[in-house]
Amino acid sequence: MMYHIPGVLSPQDVARFREQLEQAEWVDGRVTTGAQGAQVKNNQQVDTRSALYAALQNEVLNAVNQHALFFAAALPRTLSTPLFNRYQNNETYGFHVDGAVRSHPQNGWMRTDLSATLFLSDPESYDGGELVVNDTFGQHRVKLPAGDLVLYPSSSLHCVTPVTRGVRVASFMWIQSMIRDDKKRAMLFELDNNIQSLKSHYGESEEILSLLNLYHNLLREWSEI
């Protein structure tokens, strides 16, 4: 399943990020890609050795960790270090699949269950640059407001179409979920959403408590910690 997570960054945060990224040192995006991806990748990424990068990636991690909807949808166990990319002048990233595992500075290795893109450019400021994701439900074309995030299974083939006008800037990362199976994770997310909706309409009740108990027992049964 694909999820739109709005308002991960405020407009003020986005503006500050963009101002700082204007001062960043950008390098060839293929430095973080395997042999297959390098054949179809043509973009730029912020140099991960810079002090600015270290500060910005920490801010992204803090923002997603504090976002309740992101947590409910992803049920994250491990987050990769966020990266930042830029597309302009017809740069693109052809169809590819993300690697199943990635190195992690604290945990050694992590499994990539989910991929996330946090948009940092207003969609009206550039042409092209759509994230195209192919999954079992068909093809999805994504171009979200700045500050919003899209979350989708890392097993999906996906690409970024050529940016023919303006500049597309984003942050991206991978998540190892406590729930490995996409279908089980989606069921838990739907159950959680319905519990929250019922609580907002009717307040606390024995029935809602029973559903909450069911949610946590399923999470206990399925989670890998």
Curated annotation (Swiss-Prot):
<dbReference type="InterPro" id="IPR023550">
    <property type="entry name" value="PKHD_hydroxylase"/>
</dbReference>
<feature type="domain" description="Fe2OG dioxygenase">
    <location>
        <begin position="78"/>
        <end position="177"/>
    </location>
</feature>
<keyword id="KW-0560">Oxidoreductase</keyword>
<dbReference type="GO" id="GO:0031418">
    <property type="term" value="F:L-ascorbic acid binding"/>
</dbReference>
<feature type="binding site">
    <location>
        <position position="98"/>
    </location>
    <ligand>
        <name>Fe cation</name>
    </ligand>
</feature>
<dbReference type="GO" id="GO:0006879">
    <property type="term" value="P:intracellular iron ion homeostasis"/>
</dbReference>
<keyword id="KW-0847">Vitamin C</keyword>
<feature type="binding site">
    <location>
        <position position="168"/>
    </location>
    <ligand>
        <name>2-oxoglutarate</name>
    </ligand>
</feature>
<dbReference type="InterPro" id="IPR044862">
    <property type="entry name" value="Pro_4_hyd_alph_FE2OG_OXY"/>
</dbReference>
<keyword id="KW-0223">Dioxygenase</keyword>
<dbReference type="InterPro" id="IPR005123">
    <property type="entry name" value="Oxoglu/Fe-dep_dioxygenase_dom"/>
</dbReference>
<dbReference type="GO" id="GO:0005506">
    <property type="term" value="F:iron ion binding"/>
</dbReference>
<dbReference type="InterPro" id="IPR006620">
    <property type="entry name" value="Pro_4_hyd_alph"/>
</dbReference>
<feature type="binding site">
    <location>
        <position position="96"/>
    </location>
    <ligand>
        <name>Fe cation</name>
    </ligand>
</feature>
<dbReference type="InterPro" id="IPR041097">
    <property type="entry name" value="PKHD_C"/>
</dbReference>
<protein>
    <recommendedName>
        <fullName>PKHD-type hydroxylase YbiX</fullName>
        <ecNumber>1.14.11.-</ecNumber>
    </recommendedName>
</protein>
<feature type="binding site">
    <location>
        <position position="158"/>
    </location>
    <ligand>
        <name>Fe cation</name>
    </ligand>
</feature>
<dbReference type="Pfam" id="PF13640">
    <property type="entry name" value="2OG-FeII_Oxy_3"/>
</dbReference>
<keyword id="KW-0479">Metal-binding</keyword>
<dbReference type="GO" id="GO:0016706">
    <property type="term" value="F:2-oxoglutarate-dependent dioxygenase activity"/>
</dbReference>
<keyword id="KW-0408">Iron</keyword>
<dbReference type="Pfam" id="PF18331">
    <property type="entry name" value="PKHD_C"/>
</dbReference>
<dbReference type="GO" id="GO:0006974">
    <property type="term" value="P:DNA damage response"/>
</dbReference>
